[in-house]
Amino acid sequence: MSVTVVLGAQWGDEGKGKLADILAHESQICCRAQGGNNAGHTIVANGVTYDFHILPSGLVNPNCINVIGSGCVVHVPSFFKELEALEKHGLNTEGRIYISDRAHVVFDVHQQVDGLEEVELGQGFIGTTKKGIGPTYSTKMTRSGLRMCDLFDEEVFEQKLGRVVMGFQKRFGDLLQYDMQAEIEKYKGLREKLAPYVVDQIPLLASAKEKNAKILVEGANALMLDIDYGTYPFVTSSNTGLGGVLTGLTLGWRSLREVIGVVKAYTTRVGSGPFPTEQLNEFGEKLQSVGHEVGVTTGRKRRCGWLDLVVVKHSHACNDYTALNLTKLDVLDDFDELKVATSYSLNGQRLEGFPSNPDMLAQVEVQYETLPGWKKPTTGAKSYMDLPLAARKYVEYIENFVGVKVKWIGVGPARDHMISRSGNI
């Protein structure tokens, strides 16, 4: 068993990137299984800040091969833009990043349609990043989308792109202002540049498994944004949990060694959708300010609230975590007391599990447990026992409620602001 999977356990922005960065330094291969450049995270390494969107963060490790898997969707110009930004920071990525030839391609027309669909929804808008992710997965599911392998036959490429555009034109008419010929010309320039990066991931990963190489899978988004198990329809368009890993990469369940759920010490969400523990008050504002809760991809302020253990337990039920990484504990250092959600009720009746109906979810009453704050800095802590007693009790309350041990605790933004409890649990 050689595969470690890192997944978001809430609504994204949990800080998966830092743990992925730490684990990538022990890995030979780092993979993305699903999603596109709608996800985003920041890594601080050797005093340099790197922003990642579609690229795996294993690129920070010079000895790590990186794979964008078949379940991903790729906007090729954005791929190169992100790659060039990393290289400007001194990273040598040559021969270390590959895209599956089965991954679907995001075109500019998908991004335009993303915006038009949001306008169509009016007040019921999803709050997408408008990166074209949803429309690309839609054309994938209707079997009309283009994959990376389609880009290298010019005639096939133009025919297939024409069919996609025609379908959107029938729907949106003159509202769709898209120059297909300009896109075709763009890919005449990109085709040769892209060719060295596109591979068949199946033999690549099969060979790695045969050699028992250490493989890291870096999840994008999070379980509560999963198309099947999240707060549908206020979700992304792919399977963001363990299921998406197994279908988006050809690794197989028998290869799994560890499935790690990353949990922020409080809860945040970007975009629309139900958020039972959201705090539209001074507590929410303080979390937003102290936690610097602004999206890497969108620049939007994140909605903030208390830690919701109903969400985390639902996430564990779907992904079967072997360990948790609790992040941004230091953001809570200056609170007198902390609340954690332990159950929901509706019309006086306690609910079992997490509701699938978003209208019901918007009406639930949240039951909280109040825990004492610690009013001491945690950022300097190097070991678990360095943490204040109340902080340790907060960690242990989470463990006992969810039924999974917290193996890593984040107490600051830098790579070394991570406490490992491997020897304590």
From Swiss-Prot:
GO CC, one annotated term: cytoplasm
Residue numbers binding IMP: D13, E14, G15, K16, N38, A39, G40, H41, T129, R143, N221, T236, R300
Tree of life domain: Eukaryota
Organism: Phaeosphaeria nodorum (strain SN15 / ATCC MYA-4574 / FGSC 10173) (Glume blotch fungus)
Pathway the protein contributes to: Purine metabolism; AMP biosynthesis via de novo pathway; AMP from IMP: step 1/2
Catalytic reactions of this protein: IMP + L-aspartate + GTP = N(6)-(1,2-dicarboxyethyl)-AMP + GDP + phosphate + 2 H(+)
Entry binding sites for GTP: 12-18, 40-42, 302, 328-330, 410-412
Residue sites binding substrate per the record: V296, T297, T298, G299, R300, K301, R302
Gene3D superfamilies from the UniProt entry: Adenylosuccinate Synthetase, subunit A, domain 1, Adenylosuccinate Synthetase, subunit A, domain 2, Adenylosuccinate Synthetase, subunit A, domain 3
Annotated residues for binding of Mg(2+): D13, G40
Keyword Nucleotide-binding: yes
One GO-annotated biological process of the protein: IMP metabolic process
Purpose of the protein: Plays an important role in the de novo pathway and in the salvage pathway of purine nucleotide biosynthesis. Catalyzes the first committed step in the biosynthesis of AMP from IMP.
The name this protein goes by in its record: Adenylosuccinate synthetase
Source taxonomy: Eukaryota, Fungi, Dikarya, Ascomycota, Pezizomycotina
GO molecular function annotation: adenylosuccinate synthase activity; AMP binding; GMP binding; GTP binding; magnesium ion binding
The protein's Enzyme Commission number: 6.3.4.4
